[in-house]
A protein has these predicted regions:
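Aromatic- and kink-enriched transmembrane "portal" helix at the membrane-lumen/periplasm boundary
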Residues: 85, 99, 121-148, 157, ...
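Short periplasmic/luminal acceptor-recognition loop of GT-C membrane glycosyltransferases, typified by
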Residues: 416-488, 495-520, 547-556
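Extracytoplasmic catalytic/substrate-binding loops of multi-pass membrane glycan-assembly enzymes
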Residues: 33-48, 61-76, 83-86, 438-442
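Membrane-interface alpha helices of multi-pass inner-membrane proteins
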Residues: 168-185, 191-196, 218, 222, ...
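Hydrophobic alpha-helical membrane-interfacial segments at the cytosolic entry of transmembrane helices
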Residues: 15-24, 204-230, 276-284, 298-307, ...
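Transmembrane-helix motifs of polytopic, lipid-linked glycan transferases
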Residues: 90-114, 124-129, 153-156, 282-290
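Short hydrophobic alpha-helices at membrane interfaces in multi-pass membrane enzymes
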Residues: 157-179, 206-217, 296-304, 338-348
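Membrane-interface transmembrane helices that cradle and orient dolichyl/undecaprenyl
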Residues: 114, 146, 151-170, 199-204, ...
Length: 560
């Protein structure tokens, strides 16, 4: 035992990296395959790369609102390892590894080794293996998870450049930032923070900055070049850009952006006040419990109580004000902060602009909040002076460890509970999935019916969305309208949706309700008054309806 302890002391960084890698693999093996809500965005991430490998061109033959690198990455993995759920999960493993090791590299430059390790383990459980649509094994968007992972890698390389002055690290940072941009466009704004370093904080020569810009452009140029090689035209690019503009300014999208913190609205003030109240209760109660612990046994009990408090104080909102706090911290303490910390704060703010007015531990926050949490800890550690609450820096460190332990315990219980709900197996040629029983039964019924009465390559449509069924059955959607949820419905236009349904000549059309599908503050889209549904009912025969709880699938078949 002493040999192990001594080895850990001598090789702490190496051991911590090994621990993170082992925990990543164990968590991946334990949680993979168990998902809920696969009728939502999951399907898009499954089917688009398959369509690309079948000769369809993104933005030309496939209606897409996201940047291409994530889909190109998965398409490459399909080519290497086969088109399957396992390959998608393997992509997730690679992305999680980059994500958590990059985060650890950043943390280790500022924080105690124990804090850095515990923070990354907590993030691994809370974000990597999250029991919702916004996990990182099979996420709502590979482009987002790949992009944020490259963004964190970029930040890590810049921090290490500050320490070592090795310019190749900065080249790597610009390269990674370019990859983040090619995967998720908004993450390219990180370039502003890196330019602050190369031009001001730690200036490079003109020649080096030229290389920096070349490195940034490499992935975007290669990604776009591949599309052009496949046949995309300048006109296609402009058409795709125009559709993205329309899509992201629809009524439903603006509602969604406001709800997820992208826009400040007065209607959110009650939520802000509630969050402040709940955060205050949690922090005061947790500090009281922390201050009363006298040994490890009482500390474990106290951590368990704090983890329970996370549930009753709506912990999803505990991170709500992080971007605003970082801005305030930067303004108030900029003169006493090192250039590395200033860069870190700017980077964390930029990466959380999408949820600036309400960074919640939900949806996109699972991906972007970790860097903000890390940065806040670094900022507080730098500016907190000795006081009654924290007589020494070590007291503050212990309290951080206490809080992280509570969050880690809470999310571990949450993830395992969600996994237990996803307990109903169904098998397809693409792999095995475990879903909640109320979702698995209707989906399984639809899949078996499709496989029995259609052939591979024939077209089916699932409304409002459900391209996972297309992927699992090898029945293609129409690339020009693979889905038509409320966002796409508003962006495409009702008449065009109806025209696409008429021209695509589907063998079957499925209307789904429930399955975690969101309606963006409005009523269910495909009700009896919907013109598109009326058209489908006039041209197709309703063959069957299957319902399990709130989850319903209506099957319409082409008459013969």
């Amino acid at each position: 035992m002493d040999k192990i302890r001594n080895f850990y002391k001598e090789k702490t960084q190496l051991c911590n990296v090994a621990i993170l890698l082992v925990m990543t693999l164990i968590g991946w093996l334990f949680f993979k395959g168990h998902y809920s809500n696969i009728m939502t965005d999951f399907g898009r991430e499954m089917i688009f790369p398959q369509l690309m490998n079948n000769g369809n061109v993104l933005y030309k033959d496939i209606l897409c609102i996201y940047f291409p690198l994530g889909y190109q990455f998965v398409a490459l993995m399909y080519t290497l390892f086969g088109t399957s759920i396992f390959t998608l999960e393997l992509c997730g493993l690679l992305v999680i590894t980059i994500f958590v090791l990059s985060l650890y590299s950043i943390a280790a430059n500022f924080l105690d080794n124990k804090v850095s390790l515990l923070l990354c383990l907590t993030v691994l459980i809370a974000s990597g293996f999250n029991g919702t649509l916004f996990n990182m094994i099979l996420p709502y968007s590979v482009g987002f998870t790949l992009g944020i992972s490259f963004a964190l890698l970029s930040v890590s390389l810049v921090i290490n450049y500050f320490k070592s002055e090795k310019v190749y690290l900065l080249y790597g940072a610009f390269l990674s930032c370019g990859a983040a941009f090619a995967a998720k466009g908004e993450l390219g704004l990180l370039l502003i923070a890196i330019l602050y370093v190369s031009l001001c904080a730690k200036p490079c020569s003109i020649r080096q900055n030229i290389v920096n810009i070349f490195c940034f452009l490499l992935f975007p140029v290669l990604s776009l070049g591949l599309l052009m090689f496949q046949g995309i035209t300048v006109s296609d690019i402009f058409n795709a850009a125009e559709f993205m503009r329309i899509f992201f300014t629809t009524k439903s999208m603006l509602f969604h952006i406001a709800k997820t913190g992208g826009i400040f609205t007065l209607s959110n003030i009650p939520i802000y006040l509630s969050a402040i109240f709940n955060i205050a209760i949690f922090l005061f109660a947790s500090y009281f419990l922390f201050s009363k612990t006298i040994d490890k046994r009482t500390q474990i009990v106290a951590i368990g109580i704090s983890a329970y408090l996370l549930n009753i104080t709506t912990c999803w909102r505990h991170t709500m004000f992080l971007p605003i706090l970082l801005v305030i911290g930067l303004i108030c303490y900029r003169k006493q902060l090192s250039k590395e910390i200033i860069f870190l704060i700017i980077s964390a703010i930029i990466l959380n602009l999408r949820m600036f007015w309400g960074l919640i531990l939900s949806t996109y926050g699972f991906y972007t909040a970790p860097i903000a949490i890390l940065t806040l800890i670094v900022l507080l550690q730098s500016v907190i002076t000795e006081n009654k609450l924290f007589p020494t820096k070590n007291t503050f460190k212990k309290f951080v460890i206490y809080l992280l332990s509570a969050y880690c315990l809470f999310f571990a219980v949450f993830d395992i509970t969600e996994r237990m709900k996803n307990d109903t197996e169904f098998r397809t040629e693409k792999g095995v999935l475990y879903l909640p029983k109320s979702q698995a039964n209707p989906i399984n019924t639809a899949i078996k019916y499709i496989q029995s009465y259609t052939s591979v390559g024939q077209k089916i449509l699932v409304l409002p969305e459900g391209t996972a069924i297309n992927f699992l059955t090898d029945r293609n959607p129409d690339g020009k309208m693979p889905m038509a949820d409320r966002l796409y419905y508003e962006a495409i236009g009702e008449e065009v949706v109806m025209k696409n349904v008429a021209e695509a000549d589907y063998e079957m059309i499925f209307i789904a309700e429930g399955f975690g599908l969101t309606h963006f503050g409005a009523k269910y889209l495909y009700d009896d008054k919907n013109p598109v549904l009326k058209y489908i009912q006039s041209k197709y025969n309703l063959d069957w309806v299957v319902k399990d709880g709130d989850n319903i699938i209506n099957c319409y078949v082409k008459p013969y």
